[in-house]
Amino acid sequence: MTINLKSAKSPWSSLDGVDQLSLHPIKKAFNKEVMIPGSKSVTNRAFILAGLSKGTSKLSGYLKSDDTYWCIETIKKLGATVEAVGDELHITGINRSELPEKQQVFIGSAGTTARFLPGILGTQEKSEITITSTEQLAGRPHKTLHDALKQLGVKLTYLEKEGQLPVTIKGAPETGGKVSIAGNQSSQFISGLLMAAPLFNKPTEIELTTKIVQSAYVDITIEMMKQFGIHVDVSDDYTHMKVEQGEYEAATLPLEADLSTACYFMALAALNKSTIKINHLNMKSHQPDLEVVDILEKMGATVEKGTDYVVISGPEQLKGNLTIDMNACSDQALTIGSLAVFADGPITITGVEHIRHHECNRVTALTESLTKLGIEVTEHQDGWTITPGDVKAATLDTYDDHRVAMSLSLMGTKVDGIKLLDPSCVSKTCPTYFEMLASLGILVEYH
């Protein structure tokens, strides 16, 4: 298909040609069960490691979305073989020595791929790979990771603007060794270093100079590397990690459901005095958004946890007068921020300054959206204080950000007259999101 640097849309996108949609309030409380698609974070880690593994990996439960499509297209261009067999994806990997001598890959808006791939591409001296992306992803933070890779011997050349994509990556005769990097910008930087580490010429030691943000995502990476045959030594406080040289081995894996996506349905039930059971979840998952279950309980929801499911029942009135540190589960800060509008007192959300540098400035995006809806919100550097009030009808921008779109949609199930522009941005992680809402009895109109 034709690549558009302004768009990450793929054959796995949904809502093609839909410019906006309207949501309408739930007329009757529901009691439903849902199954959630695969985790984007887990899927893209598995795709990349399988693509660099010896043998054929068999992956089930993988997510089909824009981000995962461009990831799989990338590993195919690098030489991996990919075949859909029933519900599984079979990926036959390549050795790093088999990376193409020269190639250009387009990764869409997939931040995970942008952070996981560069180090791996720098492990083969003879290859020269250029990573291109959408304009949105090009401007997100990359330089901290790239500077760390330079410490490890990887050669990077920026083709347009310093610290931004596109970038050309070339290996060197000697790679690996010791590297220092800040941990408070993005856990994806740490994961990218770890995933490349066994393929460098020398053992790699990573030292973090600041506290790590969202260490649970690093846990996901370490666990996934273990499943593909590589061990990581990590200190209890995550300040020091060491990886010996090794070769990834193919794996047969069922991939976890996406707890980030699950949170919108938990929040939906909590907001609308309804009950939802979400099946086939790993309730011992490293995915940090699992913490939202406890936050919803503090807000008054009734929670039942099983080993592979959770049931959320909404209260008569959501509780407010809370201060919630959402640093560990910051992808859901907008979700809780949207619920805060309907609580019985103000809610302050802290610890999420780093989400200013995601698909959009998510802190400012929520401030602007709630203000447009007539809600009093005080923006802080690391979050907001949101005072409940009467929501008025409005047409809201989604900022080409899937998290913004899914979070704002929750308010449309409570208040009539809310329209969302560019709803197809949910295809980044959950193309079927609005169809899933409709299956719960919510009226969704496409325009």
Segments predicted by a language model, with ranges:
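Short, structured segments at the rim of ligand-binding sites
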Residues: 1-447
